[in-house]
Amino acid sequence: MAFTAMTVAPSALADLVLAQKSGCTVCHSVEAAIVGPAYKDVAAKYRGDAAAQDRLVAKVMAGGVGNWGQVPMPPNAHVPAADIKALVTWILGL
């Protein structure tokens, strides 16, 4: 069995740590859907959508249901707005 080294950019690692600290990774991961969609699926769905950043920041703050099935995403009032914006920017860049 061979192992390969994985290089992760420091900013990407910092954003993943922020997602963990904010509680996002309870329901989401980068590669695979858990309760909510995978971050890479979110990035693919909104690629090229100029309004996605603002819309997703509002959705993460307020929560909601219906964009990815019927499992609701709770509001995230405990997460600072600047952190939500940073997370959405990171996710859309995947």
UniProtKB/Swiss-Prot annotation:
InterPro entries named among the record's database cross-references: Cyt_c-like_dom, Cyt_c-like_dom_sf, Cyt_c_ID
Domain of life: Bacteria
GO molecular function, one term: electron transfer activity
Signal sequence annotation: 1-14
Residues involved in heme c binding: C24, C27, H28, M73
Post-translational modification: Binds 1 heme c group covalently per subunit.
Gene3D superfamilies membership: Cytochrome c-like domain (1.10.760.10)
Keywords of the record: Electron transport, Heme, Iron, Metal-binding, Signal, Transport
Function: Efficiently couple electron transfer between the cytochrome bc1 complex and the photosynthetic reaction center.
Protein name as it appears in the record: Cytochrome c-551
Protein source organism: Allochromatium vinosum (strain ATCC 17899 / DSM 180 / NBRC 103801 / NCIMB 10441 / D) (Chromatium vinosum)
Lineage: Bacteria, Pseudomonadati, Pseudomonadota, Gammaproteobacteria, Chromatiales
